[in-house]
Amino acid sequence: MIVKKKERLMSIDPSINNLGMAIWDMTTKKLLLWKLVHPKTDMRKNEYEKALSMSDQLREWSKIYVVNHTVLEVPEHWAVGGFEARETGSIAKLCFVCGLIYSMQYSMETCELVSPRGWKGQMPKEVMANRLQDEYWAKYQIDMNGTATDKKLNENVSDAIGIGHYKIFGSV
């Protein structure tokens, strides 16, 4: 008996407080799981432990779903904007989170890094969610923009789905 290898993709939209994650079957182009990952409650005080907790959870999900490909959104350099994020150190914290997640590459066949502009161009989050709303509501009952249930999907989860959609279908 020949067993076909599964091609599974984890798409990730990180932030310093939580992150959006989606897992796909690349062969069938089906979304298998979407989730908002929070740090474990006892990890909320230390930024580094918080990042490690989220990264560890991604590793567990990748084992459960036998993920062998990842695509991770990484921050862009803010030449003009982003003063508040720069002053509070948020960008450095986000880079730390991304670095921990990127280390998953050693257990993956591929690990792609994308910038926000790289996968959605200049498109605002709301426009991206509106573009995907009908398809993802019909297939998975995911309310990307809040029009079907008045409860909008978390932006990190929405972006994780968008990143995976971009990787699998080539555009948003």
Model-identified regions with their sequence ranges:
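Phosphate- and other anionic-substrate recognition elements at nucleic-acid/protein interfaces
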Residues: 1-172
